[in-house]
Amino acid sequence: MIISKEVKLVVENEDAVTSGEVENSEEEAMELSLRPQTLDQYLGQKRVKKEMSIYIKAAKQRDEALDHVLLYGPPGLGKTTLAFVIANELGVHLKSTSGPAIEKAGDLVALLSDLDPGDVLFIDEIHRLAKPVEEVLYSAMEDYYIDIVIGEGQTTHAVHVPLPPFTLIGATTLAGQLSAPLRDRFGIVEHMQYYTIDELEKIVQRSSDVFHTSIAPEAAHELARRSRGTPRVANRFLKRVRDFAEVKGEKTISLATTEGALKQLQVDDEGLDQTDRRLLRTMIEGYNGGPVGIRTLAANVGEDMETIESLYEPYLLQHGFILLGPRGRMVTDKAYLQLGLPVPGDK
């Protein structure tokens, strides 16, 4: 197997990334510095890290490509970052793309044909692959070959193209939308969980160091507490709170500034934002708390169904604001109380 010393990122936009090096800019460099390079640097997801560490070591000891990996869970939990870390730990190149970007089977064939032994192909939003594209993956994943049809009419014939052993890492927010044949070809399946407040605090403190910003411990805790268990949200909030602190002339981000900034951003003490509250109010005021079907809800709030199901519902479900039943979603008493509304049946 050919092993390289560092991860080489290849994406569709070659103007943005060339030879694995992102074009220099302070903001891009800062974003890259937030991304851990090893499993030890990767915060949170302890179970996933422990398992992946074993699988990676075993693959390296056998001098084999790592088995194909499926990472699923809500957005912003570090699936893409973990894919980069896995490739880095393996010491191989990583090529990155997304399901919607692979429009036809030929696009995927070109990607697969350009892989070196042991390389990682990362496909984000893999549930959005077109069916003809997905079918090309079956033989590629299972037996490391693809059949290419050449010619037209009576001259049509299939060419058998062997592929080097490689690892496909697929990421999805909607694992249920993967077809069974594709899902069954992943030897490693990992469910990414929401982060604890303590884990998010560490991420906030690490990110503040990268941003050359100081944040008070109580401010970091409050920011982490309202970040929906999601590192991406925590980092986004930190950037905005940093803006407020700089305008106020604070050298260290205070709790008061953090609370004031999050209030301005309309993020409440449970981490609910304007869209969360609109979803809950729609179910309460328009449908007496539910049950409400996803199509009806999406039409009423002006969001697409996939966004609601992947971005908003997982957090609302896990934190007890809604329940899912056979006829749709229903709000809980906790949702009424959070919105300051009387709970039905209470006197």
UniProtKB/Swiss-Prot annotation:
GO terms for molecular function: ATP binding; ATP hydrolysis activity; four-way junction DNA binding; four-way junction helicase activity. It is found in: Cytoplasm. InterPro entries: AAA+_ATPase (IPR003593), AAA_lid_4 (IPR041445), DNA_helicase_Holl-junc_RuvB (IPR004605), P-loop_NTPase (IPR027417), RuvB-like_N (IPR008824), RuvB_C (IPR008823), WH-like_DNA-bd_sf (IPR036388), WH_DNA-bd_sf (IPR036390). SUPFAM superfamilies: P-loop containing nucleoside triphosphate hydrolases, Winged helix' DNA-binding domain. Coiled coil: none annotated. The keyword DNA-binding applies. Its EC number is 3.6.4.-. Residues 13-195 are annotated as: Large ATPase domain (RuvB-L). Disulfide bonds: none annotated. GO terms for biological process: DNA recombination; DNA repair. Residues 269-347 are annotated as: Head domain (RuvB-H). It comes from the Bacteria. One of its GO terms (cellular component) is Holliday junction resolvase complex. This is Holliday junction branch migration complex subunit RuvB. It comes from Lactobacillus helveticus (strain DPC 4571). The gene is ruvB.
